[in-house]
Amino acid sequence: FGDPQAKTVKRLKKQVLAINELETVYEKMSLEKLAKQTEEFKKQLKEKKSLDDIMPHAFAVVREASKRTLGMRHFDVQLIGGMALHEGNVAEMKTGEGKTLVATAPIYLNALTGKGAHVVTVNDYLAQRDAGWMAQVYHALGLSTGVIVADQSFIFDPEFINKNHVDERMQHLKPCTRKEAYGADVTYGTNNEFGFDYLRDNMVNTVENLRQRELNFAIVDEVDSILIDEARTPLIISAPSVDSGSGYAMFAEVARKLTPEDYELDEKRRSVALNDHGVEKVQKLLKISNLYDPEHIRLIYHMDQALKAQTLFRREKEYVITKEGEIVIVDEFTGRLMHGRRYNEGLHQAIEAKEGVEVQQESMTLATISFQNYFRLYDKLSGMTGTASTEAEEFNQIYGIDVIEIPA
């Protein structure tokens, strides 16, 4: 019955014709009159029109606002990408197709419901840059824009100027509360911060202290990296545990005495386990007869972590040591230092012992969620990437979303 992919693109191309025909209508309007369309669209939605009904007009309005505020006009291919996102798909577009601009039309359209719309980026810089840049379009149309990054949140305010930012696109981001940033019509942020705020909200006692509102619509940039590569990465909020367990230094010493003949190492799977030879050696070093005796369950736990720290975690690659003697994790995707993050289940302590720095108290997990489970909470999820068709099956199986290749 033909290629469903080609059918979708053909259908979306027809819609582009409708949007293009509206261009002359909105070109004639003043910016003030253009902004009034937002209220008109909201009114139509209240009168039971659907987002799909108003989409051609909404997209045409965003294109016009973008031309006037940014001097950037959405190409047809960017409108096709935007429609694919609005329909809850992954839009696969060649880099250089201006993905930042592609997101504006579907974000504007979905923000009209008043339930919020999120743009998810891979790092703090992109979240702030894209928000400050594209917020000019939303602001011209009467919508507010918030940004959430590590330890800070902002709201776009053209009256506010922060001269410290060299990049003009970030100068109008005014510090605000987390709740205000989420309360904006549009919110930009990183996958880590969206996820952690969700966990923090699950630990508050009163509704007033909630940061997020409902998870309505999200566009995830670099979607293959966040939703597939990092899908099972757990986000963890922890507190110091009463039983911190001792003996990390002793186990680090034992691990140092082991050689590659004592364990099976699988770098690709990030796993390591003692073989029979290694078990015997450890038993001798610890002066015990059977490592796997139930009474030694804590020993096995410590030994496993010490072995992992010794063989799988390398200084300057997975972590660095600060001048203060603190072990700081390096993000494997961005190379950035992840201050305040610690490996769980005693692994961080094992690395501290291996490096001979102060071993900090072990922590207890209070709340945890994987990116996969967090993003499945959105009513509608979509994403952008340069290379997703290889993972098309996974996107469909895990998230129920299709990958649409947008023709250049």
Locate the predicted segments by residue.
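Conserved P-loop NTPase motor core
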Residues: F1-A408
